[in-house]
Protein backbone atom coordinates (compact mmCIF):
# COMPACT_ATOMS: atom_id res chain seq x y z
CA UNK A 1 0.00 0.00 0.00
CA UNK A 2 1.66 3.19 -1.19
CA UNK A 3 1.17 6.39 0.80
CA UNK A 4 2.38 9.85 -0.21
CA UNK A 5 2.14 12.99 1.93
CA UNK A 6 2.83 15.23 -1.06
CA UNK A 7 -0.17 13.71 -2.86
CA UNK A 8 -2.27 14.48 0.21
CA UNK A 9 -1.19 18.11 0.20
CA UNK A 10 -1.84 18.38 -3.55
CA UNK A 11 -5.30 16.81 -3.27
CA UNK A 12 -6.32 19.44 -0.69
CA UNK A 13 -6.08 22.43 -3.02
CA UNK A 14 -9.25 24.13 -4.23
CA UNK A 15 -8.73 23.45 -7.96
CA UNK A 16 -9.67 19.77 -7.64
CA UNK A 17 -13.06 18.52 -8.91
CA UNK A 18 -14.36 18.06 -5.34
CA UNK A 19 -13.18 18.93 -1.84
CA UNK A 20 -14.69 15.70 -0.49
CA UNK A 21 -11.87 13.52 -1.77
CA UNK A 22 -8.31 13.47 -0.42
CA UNK A 23 -5.47 10.99 -0.82
CA UNK A 24 -5.19 10.29 2.91
CA UNK A 25 -8.61 8.61 3.06
CA UNK A 26 -8.14 6.02 0.32
CA UNK A 27 -5.22 3.98 1.76
CA UNK A 28 -7.19 3.45 4.99
CA UNK A 29 -10.24 2.15 3.09
CA UNK A 30 -8.08 -0.27 1.10
CA UNK A 31 -6.16 -1.38 4.19
CA UNK A 32 -9.39 -2.22 6.02
CA UNK A 33 -10.96 -3.94 3.01
CA UNK A 34 -7.86 -6.08 2.48
CA UNK A 35 -7.88 -6.97 6.19
CA UNK A 36 -11.51 -8.08 5.75
CA UNK A 37 -10.11 -10.68 3.34
CA UNK A 38 -7.35 -11.79 5.69
CA UNK A 39 -4.62 -9.73 4.01
CA UNK A 40 -2.44 -7.44 6.13
CA UNK A 41 -0.92 -4.77 3.91
CA UNK A 42 2.36 -3.01 4.54
CA UNK A 43 2.08 0.77 4.16
CA UNK A 44 5.13 2.07 2.28
CA UNK A 45 6.01 5.65 1.25
CA UNK A 46 6.01 6.30 -2.47
CA UNK A 47 9.81 6.59 -2.47
CA UNK A 48 10.15 3.45 -0.35
CA UNK A 49 11.06 -0.09 -1.38
CA UNK A 50 7.77 -1.49 -2.69
CA UNK A 51 9.16 -2.94 -5.93
CA UNK A 52 9.57 -6.50 -4.61
CA UNK A 53 6.01 -6.97 -3.30
CA UNK A 54 3.73 -9.44 -5.05
CA UNK A 55 0.98 -6.81 -5.24
CA UNK A 56 1.09 -3.01 -4.98
CA UNK A 57 -1.85 -0.62 -4.51
CA UNK A 58 -1.64 3.02 -5.63
CA UNK A 59 -4.66 4.53 -3.83
CA UNK A 60 -5.34 8.04 -5.14
CA UNK A 61 -1.64 8.85 -5.45
CA UNK A 62 -2.34 12.24 -6.98
CA UNK A 63 1.28 13.05 -7.89
CA UNK A 64 3.39 10.75 -10.06
CA UNK A 65 6.92 11.89 -10.83
CA UNK A 66 8.87 10.58 -13.81
CA UNK A 67 10.95 8.49 -11.40
CA UNK A 68 7.86 6.92 -9.79
CA UNK A 69 6.41 6.38 -13.26
CA UNK A 70 9.53 4.48 -14.29
CA UNK A 71 9.37 2.32 -11.18
CA UNK A 72 5.68 1.53 -11.74
CA UNK A 73 6.26 0.58 -15.36
CA UNK A 74 9.29 -1.58 -14.53
CA UNK A 75 7.37 -3.27 -11.72
CA UNK A 76 4.45 -4.33 -13.91
CA UNK A 77 6.57 -5.19 -16.96
CA UNK A 78 8.59 -7.47 -14.69
CA UNK A 79 5.51 -9.42 -13.59
CA UNK A 80 4.12 -7.36 -10.72
CA UNK A 81 0.43 -6.99 -9.88
CA UNK A 82 -0.72 -3.40 -9.62
CA UNK A 83 -3.98 -1.84 -8.43
CA UNK A 84 -4.54 1.83 -9.30
CA UNK A 85 -7.51 3.92 -8.22
CA UNK A 86 -9.16 7.14 -9.33
CA UNK A 87 -7.23 10.35 -8.54
CA UNK A 88 -3.90 8.70 -9.32
CA UNK A 89 -1.44 10.28 -11.72
CA UNK A 90 -3.23 13.60 -12.08
CA UNK A 91 -0.05 15.69 -11.91
CA UNK A 92 3.72 15.35 -11.76
CA UNK A 93 5.75 16.09 -8.63
CA UNK A 94 5.52 19.84 -9.31
CA UNK A 95 1.71 19.58 -9.60
CA UNK A 96 1.82 20.18 -13.35
CA UNK A 97 -1.15 18.29 -14.77
CA UNK A 98 -0.29 15.35 -17.01
CA UNK A 99 -1.69 15.96 -20.51
CA UNK A 100 -3.69 13.48 -22.56
CA UNK A 101 -5.96 12.07 -19.87
CA UNK A 102 -5.49 10.14 -16.67
CA UNK A 103 -3.87 8.38 -14.90
CA UNK A 104 -1.29 10.50 -16.63
CA UNK A 105 2.01 8.81 -17.29
CA UNK A 106 0.74 5.26 -16.60
CA UNK A 107 -2.36 5.24 -18.82
CA UNK A 108 -0.98 2.42 -20.95
CA UNK A 109 -0.06 0.42 -17.84
CA UNK A 110 -3.70 0.29 -16.70
CA UNK A 111 -5.22 0.34 -20.19
CA UNK A 112 -7.68 3.22 -19.71
CA UNK A 113 -7.94 6.91 -20.50
CA UNK A 114 -9.97 9.04 -18.10
CA UNK A 115 -11.18 12.21 -19.79
CA UNK A 116 -13.17 13.86 -17.00
CA UNK A 117 -14.59 13.33 -13.52
CA UNK A 118 -18.09 13.10 -12.11
CA UNK A 119 -18.23 14.59 -8.61
CA UNK A 120 -21.30 13.46 -6.70
CA UNK A 121 -23.38 14.64 -3.77
CA UNK A 122 -25.72 17.47 -2.86
CA UNK A 123 -22.94 20.03 -3.36
CA UNK A 124 -23.38 19.60 -7.11
CA UNK A 125 -26.91 20.22 -8.48
CA UNK A 126 -27.95 17.91 -11.30
CA UNK A 127 -25.65 15.02 -10.42
CA UNK A 128 -26.51 11.83 -8.52
CA UNK A 129 -25.70 11.32 -4.85
CA UNK A 130 -24.07 8.00 -5.72
CA UNK A 131 -23.64 5.47 -8.54
CA UNK A 132 -24.23 1.73 -8.43
CA UNK A 133 -21.88 -0.83 -9.97
CA UNK A 134 -22.78 -4.07 -11.72
CA UNK A 135 -21.37 -6.10 -8.80
CA UNK A 136 -23.56 -4.34 -6.24
CA UNK A 137 -20.92 -1.94 -4.92
CA UNK A 138 -21.80 1.74 -4.62
CA UNK A 139 -19.59 4.68 -5.59
CA UNK A 140 -19.73 7.92 -3.63
CA UNK A 141 -18.26 11.41 -3.99
CA UNK A 142 -16.44 10.89 -7.30
CA UNK A 143 -16.31 8.62 -10.35
CA UNK A 144 -14.08 8.65 -13.40
CA UNK A 145 -15.50 9.07 -16.89
CA UNK A 146 -13.37 6.50 -18.73
CA UNK A 147 -13.38 7.58 -22.36
CA UNK A 148 -11.47 4.66 -23.85
CA UNK A 149 -10.24 1.18 -22.95
CA UNK A 150 -7.20 -0.36 -24.66
CA UNK A 151 -7.49 -3.56 -26.65
CA UNK A 152 -5.31 -5.36 -24.11
CA UNK A 153 -7.74 -4.50 -21.30
CA UNK A 154 -10.95 -6.14 -20.07
CA UNK A 155 -13.82 -4.42 -18.29
CA UNK A 156 -14.57 -6.28 -15.05
CA UNK A 157 -17.41 -4.09 -13.78
CA UNK A 158 -19.51 -1.27 -15.18
CA UNK A 159 -21.62 1.43 -13.61
CA UNK A 160 -25.25 0.36 -13.36
CA UNK A 161 -27.60 3.24 -12.69
CA UNK A 162 -30.33 5.39 -14.21
CA UNK A 163 -29.61 6.35 -17.84
CA UNK A 164 -29.99 10.06 -17.05
CA UNK A 165 -26.71 9.93 -15.11
CA UNK A 166 -24.86 9.31 -18.38
CA UNK A 167 -22.81 6.62 -16.64
CA UNK A 168 -25.00 3.53 -17.06
CA UNK A 169 -22.86 0.85 -18.72
CA UNK A 170 -19.65 2.90 -18.53
CA UNK A 171 -16.46 1.09 -17.37
CA UNK A 172 -15.88 1.19 -13.61
CA UNK A 173 -13.22 -1.48 -12.93
CA UNK A 174 -10.80 -2.53 -15.69
CA UNK A 175 -7.98 -5.08 -15.79
CA UNK A 176 -5.06 -4.94 -18.20
CA UNK A 177 -2.02 -6.96 -19.26
CA UNK A 178 1.22 -4.99 -19.50
CA UNK A 179 4.48 -6.78 -20.11
CA UNK A 180 4.69 -9.83 -17.86
CA UNK A 181 2.38 -8.32 -15.25
CA UNK A 182 -1.22 -7.26 -14.78
CA UNK A 183 -3.03 -4.23 -13.46
CA UNK A 184 -6.50 -3.29 -12.24
CA UNK A 185 -7.92 0.23 -12.44
CA UNK A 186 -10.73 1.18 -10.03
CA UNK A 187 -12.43 4.29 -11.38
CA UNK A 188 -14.53 5.40 -8.41
CA UNK A 189 -14.51 5.89 -4.66
CA UNK A 190 -16.07 2.67 -3.37
CA UNK A 191 -15.28 2.87 0.34
CA UNK A 192 -14.33 -0.10 2.50
CA UNK A 193 -17.49 -2.14 1.78
CA UNK A 194 -17.40 -1.59 -1.98
CA UNK A 195 -13.71 -2.42 -2.15
CA UNK A 196 -14.22 -5.58 -0.10
CA UNK A 197 -17.06 -6.62 -2.40
CA UNK A 198 -14.87 -6.05 -5.47
CA UNK A 199 -11.67 -7.67 -4.17
CA UNK A 200 -12.47 -11.32 -5.05
CA UNK A 201 -12.78 -10.42 -8.73
CA UNK A 202 -9.75 -8.15 -8.54
CA UNK A 203 -7.67 -10.92 -6.97
CA UNK A 204 -8.85 -13.39 -9.60
CA UNK A 205 -8.01 -11.06 -12.48
CA UNK A 206 -4.52 -10.60 -11.04
CA UNK A 207 -4.04 -14.35 -10.65
CA UNK A 208 -3.91 -14.21 -6.86
CA UNK A 209 -5.66 -16.08 -4.06
CA UNK A 210 -8.99 -14.51 -3.08
CA UNK A 211 -8.18 -14.49 0.63
CA UNK A 212 -5.04 -14.18 2.70
CA UNK A 213 -3.70 -16.54 5.33
CA UNK A 214 -4.83 -14.47 8.32
CA UNK A 215 -8.08 -14.58 10.29
CA UNK A 216 -10.04 -11.59 8.99
CA UNK A 217 -11.26 -10.89 12.54
CA UNK A 218 -7.71 -10.27 13.73
CA UNK A 219 -5.11 -7.84 12.44
CA UNK A 220 -1.84 -9.76 12.61
CA UNK A 221 1.44 -7.85 12.30
CA UNK A 222 4.93 -9.36 12.55
CA UNK A 223 8.07 -7.45 13.47
CA UNK A 224 11.64 -8.70 13.73
CA UNK A 225 14.11 -7.26 16.24
CA UNK A 226 17.76 -6.40 15.64
CA UNK A 227 18.77 -9.62 17.41
CA UNK A 228 16.60 -11.72 15.10
CA UNK A 229 13.78 -12.25 17.60
CA UNK A 230 10.31 -12.11 16.08
CA UNK A 231 7.23 -10.53 17.63
CA UNK A 232 3.62 -11.07 16.54
CA UNK A 233 0.98 -8.42 17.33
CA UNK A 234 -2.65 -9.63 17.19
CA UNK A 235 -5.40 -6.99 17.37
CA UNK A 236 -9.13 -7.78 17.63
CA UNK A 237 -10.84 -5.92 14.77
CA UNK A 238 -14.39 -6.85 15.80
CA UNK A 239 -16.95 -5.91 18.45
CA UNK A 240 -16.96 -9.43 19.89
CA UNK A 241 -14.41 -11.63 21.65
CA UNK A 242 -12.17 -13.60 19.28
CA UNK A 243 -10.39 -16.83 20.19
CA UNK A 244 -7.08 -17.65 18.53
CA UNK A 245 -4.22 -20.07 19.27
CA UNK A 246 -1.26 -18.74 21.24
CA UNK A 247 1.87 -18.40 19.09
CA UNK A 248 4.99 -18.33 21.25
CA UNK A 249 5.30 -16.58 24.60
CA UNK A 250 2.87 -13.79 25.48
CA UNK A 251 4.88 -10.72 26.50
CA UNK A 252 2.11 -8.09 26.44
CA UNK A 253 -1.67 -8.44 26.60
CA UNK A 254 -4.61 -6.10 26.99
CA UNK A 255 -8.27 -7.15 27.22
CA UNK A 256 -7.24 -10.77 26.68
CA UNK A 257 -7.60 -14.01 28.65
CA UNK A 258 -5.47 -17.13 28.19
CA UNK A 259 -7.11 -20.54 28.41
CA UNK A 260 -4.77 -23.45 27.73
CA UNK A 261 -3.28 -23.12 24.25
CA UNK A 262 -5.79 -20.47 23.17
CA UNK A 263 -6.35 -16.83 24.03
CA UNK A 264 -9.63 -14.92 23.98
CA UNK A 265 -9.10 -11.35 22.82
CA UNK A 266 -11.94 -9.01 23.78
CA UNK A 267 -13.02 -6.02 21.67
CA UNK A 268 -10.19 -3.44 21.51
CA UNK A 269 -7.87 -6.12 22.86
CA UNK A 270 -4.37 -7.05 21.73
CA UNK A 271 -1.68 -9.59 22.52
CA UNK A 272 2.01 -9.52 21.65
CA UNK A 273 3.89 -12.80 21.49
CA UNK A 274 7.59 -13.50 21.11
CA UNK A 275 8.44 -16.35 18.77
Please give the residue ranges for each predicted region.
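Carbohydrate-binding surfaces of carbohydrate-active enzymes
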Residues: 1-275
Amino acid sequence: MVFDYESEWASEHTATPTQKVHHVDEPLQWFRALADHGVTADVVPVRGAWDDYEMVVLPSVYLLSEETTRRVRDYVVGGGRLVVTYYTGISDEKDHVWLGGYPGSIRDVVGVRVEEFMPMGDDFPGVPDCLGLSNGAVAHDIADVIGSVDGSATVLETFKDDPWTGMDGAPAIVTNTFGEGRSVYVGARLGRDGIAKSLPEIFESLGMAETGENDSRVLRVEREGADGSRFVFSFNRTHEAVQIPVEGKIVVSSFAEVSGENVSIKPNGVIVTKQ
